[in-house]
Amino acid sequence: QAIFWHIYDPVKKGTWRSNRVKSITVSGNVITYTRHVPYPPLVLDSEFIGDCPGKGHSLELGSATVELVELVGADTVKITLDQAPSQTDHLLIGFTNTTPANNGNIYPVVCIRDSSTKVSRKVMRNGAAFPLYNWAVLERVDIDCSFTDTL
């Protein structure tokens, strides 16, 4: 889709951003972050590729545990933790899956995607064109301060 965006869509040309964290804030036991979303709104999807603990969210040092992940806007995710996280911890996105695939390997999973209506011209799934969603990318995000990604 990034190639299509850059070559064929004159309105969006040069504006592609992957589905990644744009800004983050921490208030007590709540982490709220916004994402660059190619085709809003965000979708919390645990059916298409599977579910995993915390919808793919965890804290690297384990200073708090994810209790709830919810979408609170077209580009905003709210994570409720069991307690306030350590400011030296990092939010990990995509590293909580423990379920092996059919080949026995365990792959990263994030249950957040955009609402792209684009489909593959060649790949089919259950008799229908394969959807080309933009899934959230794997990330390690500092939570020690608020930031905004301006790229």
Language model features with spans:
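Short, aromatic- and glycine-rich surface loops/edge beta-strands on solvent-exposed regions
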Residues: 88-95
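Contiguous mid-protein beta-loop-alpha structural module that forms a pocket-lining wall or clamp
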Residues: 1-3
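Short beta-strand elements
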Residues: 108-151
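Short beta-strand/loop motifs in extracellular/secreted proteins, especially
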Residues: 55-57, 89
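Surface beta-strand/loop "capping" patches
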Residues: 5-51, 60-72
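Short acidic/polar inter-strand loop motif in beta-rich domains
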Residues: 95-113
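Active-site proximal loops enriched in glycine and acidic residues that flank catalytic Cys/His/Asp
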Residues: 35, 81-83, 95
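A surface-exposed beta-strand-loop module
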Residues: 66-88
